[in-house]
């Protein structure tokens, strides 16, 4: 079994990837989507989203990073994919699942699930453009308005050359509302010969067990569940081995938060950093009651020095 950290725009950036992969249990992670259209993007654009390329395409914990592209122009995607490989991408992932309205209006993400033929063209052209030893993978939802074309889309991706398909078991219209329709993952696996990875609504070890029972998927991808419970992958890995599951305590999480905050101060402006910390705290409230107290304490705080003191960070250089 492999457990992947999902790509989430504006949330799972290199700072949070570094924090979460250090906890353990995550086998690979993916960049936020890198939007490409009409032209070959410069190297610094890729490094912005994948700073791990400077570290052999791995986080400091040694977790491999995949690079995800988003767009609808097969030629442009293929050219940028080839360049990304030159920069160090070990795996190329294609985004056909983003539900954001602004992205869909620009013919990116889940809107392309209405066009299985285009999915096939994109994957096949990217596959031809990158070295044979670099896998091309894809992430999809079950459809746009409904699941009518789910199987056709999966076939198109596999036939185009996708080596693996991550299935977020909801439609675009479903957004992130529960439930995730895990039974569809099993149906998709029946019609394609490549591995299918289950994604959606895995917040606990028990969710993982139910997902596995329903869809039979060997591998899983977790997004918000891992952000809300940073040791979830480690818990699942332990459960899968029959070992005792010992959840991370709030006290054990504190050093992570402090390190994360210090990294935000280094990589972001003093205006951006407080919002980034609060964004993570909001999701942590789903697993830790103490996070609610901390969030309420910091909610209106914008002074970074004050936040540093409230977090108990050392002010020494």
Curated annotation (Swiss-Prot):
Top EC group: oxidoreductase
State a single Gene Ontology molecular function. FMN binding
- The record's EC number reads 1.3.1.-
Which residue positions are annotated as catalytic? 98
User: Which Pfam family, an example, fits this chain?
Assistant: Dus
Q: Where does FMN bind?
A: 7-9, 68, 139, 199-201, 223-224
Q: Which UniProt keywords apply?
A: Flavoprotein, FMN, NADP, Oxidoreductase, RNA-binding, tRNA processing, tRNA-binding
Q: What does this protein do?
A: Catalyzes the synthesis of 5,6-dihydrouridine (D), a modified base found in the D-loop of most tRNAs, via the reduction of the C5-C6 double bond in target uridines. Specifically modifies U16 in tRNAs.
**What protein name is recorded for this chain?**
tRNA-dihydrouridine(16) synthase
Q: Which organism is it from?
A: Pseudomonas syringae pv. tomato (strain ATCC BAA-871 / DC3000)
């Amino acid at each position: 079994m492999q457990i992947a950290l999902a790509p989430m725009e504006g949330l799972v950036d290199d700072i949070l990837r570094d924090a979460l992969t250090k906890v353990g249990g995550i086998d690979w992670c993916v960049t936020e989507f890198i939007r490409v259209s009409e032209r070959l993007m410069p190297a610094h654009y890729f490094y912005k989203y994948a700073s791990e390329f400077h570290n052999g395409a791995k986080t400091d914990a040694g977790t491999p990073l995949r690079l995800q592209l988003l767009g609808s122009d097969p030629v442009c995607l293929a050219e940028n994919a080839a360049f990304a490989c030159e920069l160090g991408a070990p795996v190329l992932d294609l985004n056909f699942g983003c539900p954001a309205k602004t992205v869909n209006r620009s013919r990116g993400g889940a809107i392309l699930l209405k066009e299985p033929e285009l999915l096939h063209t994109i994957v096949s052209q990217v596959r031809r453009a990158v070295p044979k030893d670099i896998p091309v993978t894809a992430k999809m939802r079950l459809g746009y308005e409904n699941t009518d074309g789910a199987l056709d889309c999966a076939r198109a991706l596999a036939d185009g050359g996708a080596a693996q398909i991550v299935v977020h078991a909801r439609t675009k219209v479903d957004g992130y509302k529960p439930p995730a329709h895990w039974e569809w993952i099993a149906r998709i696996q029946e019609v394609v010969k490549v591995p299918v990875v289950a994604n959606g609504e895995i917040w606990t070890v028990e969710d993982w067990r139910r997902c596995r029972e329903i869809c039979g998927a060997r591998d899983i991808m977790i997004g918000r569940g891992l952000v809300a419970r940073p040791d979830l992958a480690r818990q699942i890995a332990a459960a899968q081995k029959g070992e005792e599951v010992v959840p991370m305590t709030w006290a054990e999480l504190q050093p992570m938060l402090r390190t994360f905050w210090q990294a935000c101060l280094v990589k972001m402006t003093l205006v951006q950093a407080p919002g980034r910390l609060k964004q993570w705290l909001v999701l942590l409230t789903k697993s830790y009651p103490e996070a609610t107290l901390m969030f309420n304490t910091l909610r209106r705080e914008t002074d970074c020095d004050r936040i540093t003191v409230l977090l108990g960070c050392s002010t020494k250089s």
